[in-house]
Every structure is written in C-alpha cells, then in structure tokens.
Amino acid sequence: MMLSTEGREGFVVKVRGLPWSCSAEEVMRFFSDCKIQNGTSGVRFIYTREGRPSGEAFVELESEDEVKLALKKDRETMGHRYVEVFKSNSVEMDWVLKHTGPNSPDTANDGFVRLRGLPFGCSKEEIVQFFSGLEIVPNGMTLPVDFQGRSTGEAFVQFASQEIAEKALKKHKERIGHRYIEIFKSSRAEVRTHYDPPRKLMTMQRPGPYDRPGAGRGYNSIGRGAGFERMRRGAYGGGYGGYDDYGGYNDGYGFGSDRFGRDLNYCFSGMSDHRYGDGGSSFQSTTGHCVHMRGLPYRATENDIYNFFSPLNPMRVHIEIGPDGRVTGEADVEFATHEDAVAAMAKDKANMQHRYVELFLNSTAGTSGGAYDHSYVELFLNSTAGASGGAYGSQMMGGMGLSNQSSYGGPASQQLSGGYGGGYGGQSSMSGYDQVLQENSSDYQSNLA
C-alpha cells in the first residue's frame, strides 16, 4: 500500500522559544493533549555547535490529527516564555539535527570542552584537579587572556577521547572555589574560529576618519605588556601553547607555526582594529552579520542576551570586557544571516531588566564573513550594501529607518535603494568624508590581502 505524502514525511512539529533549561518532560507536559511518538524520545532538541540549547526542538507525533492539536498550542506560554509551534516534516528534522549541534560533522569526536566562569587567577592545576580522573591530552589545555594578560574566565580543554569529554560535561555547574563552572561541548574548529584574529592586526594602519587621538587604544596601538609576553611564550610553544610545570599547559594561546604563531595568541584578539576609535571589543565575526549592543545591565549574562533576542537564535554572544577587567555594558551578537541580524534590530530600545538597550547593525547583505569595520551611530543605523571582501563601514544618514546604500558626501545623483524599515534617510550632507572613507577602505582591504 502506498503511503500518503503526510505518512512519508512523518508527523512533526517544530517548537521555538523554549526556555534554555527546558527538559523533554516539560515539552511533553506542554503538549499534554497530544500523543507524542515514543514518549520523551520523540522530543528532539536542537543545539548550537557549542552544545548550548538553541531554544528549539522537533516533536514527533503519532498522526496528522495530533499535529493539528499541537499547532493549536502556538503562542501559548511555557514558564515566562511564549512558544511558537510550526508544522515541519521528518526530512527537515533529519537535516537540521545532522547539521547542527556539537556532534555535527565538523565538531564531533575531537574531545574538546569549553569552560566558562572560572575564578580570577584560576590555575591549570586547579582545572586538572576539577577534572580528576579524566585524561587530558598533552598540551591540551588553553587559558585565553585579554590584551593586558588577564584571564578571561574561560578555558578550552581537550580530553583523550570523546567519551571522556562526555564525562567531563557531567561536571557542568560544579564549583571551583566559590564559582560554579559552566561546561559546553566545543571543537578545534570553534577554538580557532573564536580566537583567530585577522593578520591585519599585526600591521600599523593609518587612522580612520573617526579615530580619536586621545582615546588610548585608537590608532591600532599595541602595547608590550604582560599580555604580549604571555602571547609570545604561548605562540612559540608546541601544540596549544607551550608545555611547562604540571607536565605543563602553557598559559599562552597559540597554535604556533609561523614567526608570530599563525593562529595568534588570544591576547591579540583584544587589540582589535579600532579604526573608528570607539571600542575595546575583542570580537571577530565569522559570518559578518552582527548586532552591537550598548546599555546592558552590568550583571547581564550570555543567556540573558540569548533570551533578549528570542525567538531569533544568535550563533554567538561576546560580552565586552574593559581594560580594567570589568564589563563595559556592551556586547556583540553574531547571527547566521543578514536577514536575522536585520530582524534583531526590532529589539532596539527594548528593556533588559531595568535598562533599555541600544542596538547597532553590523551586517551587509551578501557578506559571507571576514573582517569588517563599524561605527556606532545614535538613534538609527544605515547599512551599506554590496561590500566587497567582507570589509565595510556603517554610515549615518539624515533620516529614520534603515537603508542598504549610503555615502558620505556622494554626488547629487546618489540614490537610495531597498531600505529596511519604514523610513529612509535623506541625502547625506557630510561632504568631504567620502574620499577619506574610500582611501581608508582601499588601504584596509590591501592590508587584508
């Protein structure tokens, strides 16, 4: 007997907006009027590549009638979150589950975990003791530092096998000292992607039009402080930073190969290209589709930010740490696509706890990653389109809304096209800057080459 189209595709719904701590049992209670195939095994959560819950799941049901019942739960609440329910199918479910999460082809079986929330001054020996009985590979521990040589509170640890790494994950939320430690699945690819700053950071470029001479960290200045020394030690070491006491695990972070250690020490990430002189961000985008946040509560966590953008699913959140080691109230949030980044801008001026948060778009249609410049603008932002080589700048125009083409002082025939939002900025009156920006962009891209 031929199966119907519905039978071949299965009876599946996709759920979005789940609380991060949600369990399969809670999903079953949410769909208590529906018959779920195989009980809790019919609830298939979607995870990020770092092993964090994405807030989404697929639910396999027993019939088309059960799917219709499940769809009636759309926009109902679970805890303090409203949950969206969409019709899906087994083809979509299988593809998504195969290509996402820490067990996707490019992240599986390398035994990495990422630790977050380490106490200030936490040593390698304390981490080894924390994972007592679990074998860590030689040179398999990395303690990233900021540009002043201070610990970021994170660590990457590579275990002797994926099975041992799975055991390590069970220590999630256990304590080192007075701090509870969060543990996520990771991978060699994540380590390199997260902390490999572009080589342009080794060059001294001339200042951009918005660099501030008195800003301290403007003009791409690089100081040879403790961070530089720690980088130098790690970058010349073998593996993931040199070997020292304990059988070693150097503090440095370098995958070392060429004269500066091809994948530079993490401390260089903190010395980002402040061409517009406005930030202390160590964030390096991998997709080119980001939103910068300003005005965050000082106690805001990554999970608070993920919740803030729900039901959108950011790929990565980076909370900025200032030179004094304290949070700055700013963060960079990376999205998979330009469309997601634009949709996230709907949250501009929304509240997080008692603070309203300003958002600034750092994304260009057609950009597929790479380095980019950004300037923060008040009240609104216009995003330039068609940037080449992944490098672009964000410019301000004279009206409200978002436009995907803009120019400082272009000719009168300059046209606006395809803007996002309800309004369009007027013709820029900031003549005289266009040539500077073009020269600066040319110089910037030549350095990237």
From Swiss-Prot:
It is found in: Nucleus, Nucleoplasm. The keyword GTP-binding does not apply. InterPro entries: ESRP (IPR050666), Nucleotide-bd_a/b_plait_sf (IPR012677), RBD_domain_sf (IPR035979), RRM_dom (IPR000504), Znf_CHHC (IPR012996). Residues 234-433 are annotated as: 2 X 16 AA Gly-rich approximate repeats. Residues 11-90, 111-188, 289-364 form the RRM domain. The modification N-acetylmethionine is found at M1, M2. Residues 354-392 are annotated as: 2 X 19 AA perfect repeats. Sequence repeats lie at residues 234-249, 354-372, 374-392, 418-433. GO terms for molecular function: RNA binding. The modification Omega-N-methylarginine is found at R233. There is a cross-link at K35, K87, K98 (Glycyl lysine isopeptide (Lys-Gly) (interchain with G-Cter in SUMO2)). This is Heterogeneous nuclear ribonucleoprotein H2. It comes from Mus musculus. The lineage of its organism: Eukaryota, Metazoa, Chordata, Craniata, Vertebrata.
